[in-house]
């Protein structure tokens, strides 16, 4: 059993299922968050804001970073050498060629954050693994599947931009938690970056249909011209209903955003679950 780990951003989507798994592998689990959550077996919560400088105790052997990646490099700079597993996102690649300048700028910021983390890890002797999940779902807090779930339950139908034939590969947060544990257990993942998708590659239209049927609704999905949805997305962002939305998603609805799971499957036995449109029923498996 490993000695001690720190989980930053522990109240994030992935934090819930991950904190259920870590006490089986560490004598002590420290969960850092600006908003500590309910007590979990074997987990000690600590209020922490990574925009400030925090010193990690010398007894900590592992750092699992779920907070925004841009906050990690300063933490690594002031820490002793550790095993580090950090969550990035496939948006680094998928939004790099977006029609939206804002999305391209975001992708560039994410890429720069990855570069800074990699350079700092090498400089300070940390053993780093980067994980890039695809479209997250399962905690009811994501910007795509959770939104579709709420709309499906309320209205019984969903609207998609155009034909919405771009492929997606939604990955459950519990599968990402299992991937983190897999990296802890397999040293061959050190120095690598893995993209993580779900088991299924489905079009955005099929995803909407699955959300409806898995929630007991008829598969009523209607195509709407993108130009009609553009003011809706702008309004949702301006009114802060969905501040993360951008009109670039209308263009990306027609493009594939998938990943290759084979490197993760080969190196640490990654085995994602089938897509579940309810999303909230995935059981965390202790291995």
Enumerate the predicted regions with their spans.
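Mid/C-terminal beta-alpha module of Rossmann-like enzyme folds, strongest
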Residues: 186-245, 261-262, 266-287
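N-terminal Rossmann-fold cofactor-binding loop
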Residues: 31-36
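Active-site Tyr-X1-5-Lys
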Residues: 104-130, 139-147
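Substrate-positioning beta->alpha
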Residues: 142-147, 162-184, 191-195
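Alpha-helical membrane-targeting segments
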Residues: 147-173, 218-257
């Amino acid at each position: 059993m490993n000695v001690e780990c720190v989980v930053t951003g522990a109240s994030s989507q992935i934090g819930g299922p991950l904190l259920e798994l870590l006490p089986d592998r560490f004598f002590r689990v420290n969960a850092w968050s600006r908003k500590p959550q309910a007590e979990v077996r074997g987990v000690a919560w600590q209020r922490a804001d990574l925009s400030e400088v925090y010193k990690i105790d010398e007894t900590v052997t592992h750092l699992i970073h779920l907070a925004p990646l841009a906050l990690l490099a300063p933490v690594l700079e002031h820490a002793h050498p550790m095993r580090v597993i950090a969550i990035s996102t496939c948006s680094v690649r998928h939004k790099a060629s977006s029609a939206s300048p804002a999305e391209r700028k975001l992708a560039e910021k994410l890429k720069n954050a990855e570069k800074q983390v990699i350079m700092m890890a090498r400089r300070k002797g940390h053993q780093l693994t980067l994980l890039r999940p695809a479209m997250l779902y399962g905690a009811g807090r994501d910007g795509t599947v959770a939104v579709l779930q709420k709309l499906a339950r309320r209205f019984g139908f969903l609207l998609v931009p155009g034909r919405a034939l771009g492929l997606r590969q939604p990955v459950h947060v519990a599968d990402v938690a299992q991937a983190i544990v897999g990296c802890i257990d397999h040293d061959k993942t050190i120095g690598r970056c893995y993209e993580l998708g779900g088991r299924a590659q489905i079009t955005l239209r099929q995803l909407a249909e699955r959300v409806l049927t898995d929630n007991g609704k008829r598969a009523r999905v209607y195509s709407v011209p993108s130009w009609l949805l553009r003011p809706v997305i702008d309004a949702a962002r301006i009114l802060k209903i969905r501040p993360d939305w951008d009109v670039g998603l209308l263009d990306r609805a027609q493009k594939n955003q998938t990943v290759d799971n084979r490197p993760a499957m080969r190196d640490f036995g990654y085995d994602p679950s089938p897509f579940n449109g309810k999303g909230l029923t995935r059981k965390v498996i202790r291995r």
